[in-house]
Amino acid sequence: MVVLHEILDGPNGDDPNNNPQEGEDNQNENPQEEVENLRNLLELPEELIERLIAHIPRCYYPYISLVSRDFRQVITSDKLFRTRSLLGFNEPVLYALIGSTQTPLSWFFLRWSNFPLELHRIRSLPTVLLGAAVVTIGYKMYVMGGTIGLNHHVSTVIVIDCRNHTWNYLPDMKRARYRAAAGEIGGRIYVIGGRKKQDADWVEVFNATTESWETVSSVCPNDASANGVFSTYVVMQGRIFALDRWGCFAYKPVQGLWQSWGVASELTRFWHPLSSFTVIGELLYTVDLTCSLGHPIVVYYPNESVWRPVMGFHLPILSQCWSKIANFGGKLVIFCTCLGTFKHILCIVIALEARQGGHIWGVVESNSRVFRDDMMLPYIRLCQTVTF
């Protein structure tokens, strides 16, 4: 049995425990006054409605959308997203793709405004192909390439609108790609590798405004794998860092320059295919189960080329193979299973602070069990954070 909080359609919003009868019992004793108040609300100018809604946490939007069609249009508009961004009211929402040993992958999302923290299942989105590259820009999530079966690599691209959990196809990439590296820099998405290494078409760039692809001519690094397969990637300091079996590579689109580190470099000391990584404040974070620096969370300082521990808190013994970390609005989020509780997924939220000497300290703000499968062993394919 899977225990979670599911998104339901209908007047009860996203709370399955809501009782419609309770709403009727608690209605205003003066229905005429209620009707008048609603009529006045519906007569507000659209711009005023937009500014009012912009100040309200997004967790209440399913309820607000029931007021009228005009309110629903405002909630799903690009203009509201821009207004919230200008006012500094954007909120992070974390998406996770979770499956188990015998059940298919499903999308879930987590809002920081929900207490206690809960995962919400999304049934309207397609799963992500094995080996697909995923990049987020604002409230959109771009899923590119992957494989169908063992050797049928694809160039397919879809975009997910996380405001209303809809999706559609975008123009295909010019080449099929499997386990490519990708990242957004300057509003454009660069996709690297995922196919046989050759200078002419190893890099493609997607213009999100015109929704078009262009091939970027680039001299491939000599020591990169010939098949162009990458195990993981991040964006840091305006560069796309990608890891393959031979080492780490960084591509800077502005100059079209490559930089490489071997498998024995300091950067790859903790960066390996089994680990999950995220970038917060231009620093690279990961989990180190060996605690070789005295702590399970370590951070890489690219300007100094050094790893240091994140201090100030204790964690349960994590399972590295089943742990994923993400940047959740500047906080470090860990989705993990722990030794002895492999059928549970915990969500640990850590607030970070840079102290004197440049050391990072953390405080655990939340440690919640957000998923349980009593029958199967759950696993987390990916975690991505969008902001809107």
UniProtKB/Swiss-Prot annotation:
Kelch repeats: 140-187, 189-233
One Pfam match: F-box
Keyword set includes Transmembrane helix: no
Domain of life: Eukaryota
Signal peptide: none
SMART domains, per database record: Kelch
Residue span of region Disordered: 6-33
Keywords for the protein's UniProt record, in alphabetical order: Kelch repeat, Repeat
Compositional bias (Acidic residues): 22-33
Stretches with biased composition (Low complexity): 9-21
Family matches, as InterPro entries: F-box-like_dom_sf (IPR036047), F-box/kelch-repeat_ARATH (IPR050354), F-box_dom (IPR001810), Kelch-typ_b-propeller (IPR015915), Kelch_1 (IPR006652)
Domain annotation F-box: ranges: 38-84
Name the record gives this protein: Putative F-box/kelch-repeat protein At2g29820
Protein's organism: Arabidopsis thaliana (Mouse-ear cress)
